């Protein structure tokens, strides 16, 4: 056997061996395609599909810092220094289509911090601890402000009362409820009918609200009941609501009208009446039988909006507030505001001073 024959035989043997090993080799599977996040534009900006589902999710919120000085326009007391408050609000919306309509949820978590020189106003923080923050100090708290489910016109969960939401709240000022218009957060079951001609109606069963000093929740099986009617068009809107409080067995009602004078200037007026002439109730929290609120908004430029609100109640409280909301850059707004309250009539005996002047500057980054 010559060397050439030996080399050819060795090469043939190596090829045969490698072929046998290849037959037994494990072939790695192809990696699955990655499902990237898809934009969902069916419900507005900021939504995306939750991977693997047809549910759209939006995550948004704001960071806010307030600095207050002067008098407390709610109580008439002198702050004797600066009051500060911070809030981080985180919001989640989900929406998907079903055979019964749009199925949605909304939740809002609030992380609050307050550092007050002389008192607290209840706007920030959880004041359930042992410290007397009414005399100054620091308080923090976490709050589940909203958590509700919607299906078509049906809504159930934690929300704000239809006595406020259906008629459109008050004005676009920070100190809007010096003359109070009712409690806000409540558990509720509600149904809203929306017609195609601008007409809508609502009926709601509510648990009632509470604040730092008072609890207006129901004390049995009978819920608070709210009903309302609204008509809206290009000119503006008119809305009315009636509420029954089973705890005190009294009722309250209000009517609001909004008029768009131009595309930049609008005015509104609201009147309310309660069968119980006391602020200590869930809905008619103004003083006396009746109260009125009114205001105006003027969009001066793309960055600056002027807001004005005035209110007066049967017991003699008058409150006026004005501000300028200035958008420094998109998503960041600075709002200086000044407020005045005159405590007349029956309110004189409940406050330290008859006249109160206060100011606030709010810095808010929304995302």
Curated annotation (Swiss-Prot):
Disulfide pairs? Answer: none
Q: Which gene encodes it?
A: omp2a
- According to its UniProt record, where is this protein located? Cell outer membrane
MF (Gene Ontology) = porin activity
Query: How would you summarize the oligomeric state and partners of this protein?
Result: Monomer.
Q: Which UniProt keywords apply?
A: Cell outer membrane, Ion transport, Membrane, Porin, Signal, Transmembrane, Transmembrane beta strand, Transport
Species for this entry: Brucella canis (strain ATCC 23365 / NCTC 10854 / RM-666)
Q: Which GO terms describe its biological process?
A: monoatomic ion transport
List the signal peptide residues.
1-22
- Bilayer topology: Multi-pass membrane protein
Q: Name one GO cellular component term.
A: cell outer membrane
Tell me the function of this protein. Forms passive diffusion pores that allow small molecular weight hydrophilic materials across the outer membrane.
Is Ion transport included in the keywords of this UniProt record? yes
Report what the protein is called.
Answer: Porin Omp2a
State the SUPFAM superfamilies in the record: Porins
